[in-house]
Amino acid sequence: MINLRIEVIKYSKMLNTKKLSALRSGNISARYKDGFLITPSGAKYSLLKSKDIVFVSLKGEFDKKKGIPSSEWRFHQDIYNNKKEAKAIVHAHSNYATAISTHGKGIPAFHYMVAMAGGNDIKCAKYATYGTRELSKNILKALRQRNACLI
């Protein structure tokens, strides 16, 4: 599990270094046994240690004494429960993706890389407050037959 925690940290730091998310925004998780490992709430990625990565069960249970998961843990849980093939989730707040998502429309197949999302477009999940079941439902709908979506 230590190696997987280190991988979560490595890619979390890349959110910042690759300018995909600023400071503490975004979150990353990786499926692990009967749950997943996820970045903690409000943590500065450059300072993360293995012990900071939080384990959340697929039932949504976690030990608060060991850390508080990202406020977006619920949609990670729902994706892992509904998409058995999902092994990891990256939720970034890039300037471009954020700008596009504010229009509430997906990305059409203007480039062959769109197909990497699993379809002929990238869907945009309908807006809902962060951390809610409603947001999870909207994300799952946007992910039908897809590997990626805008939020």
At which residue positions do the language-model features occur?
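Glycine-rich flexible loops
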Residues: 1-151
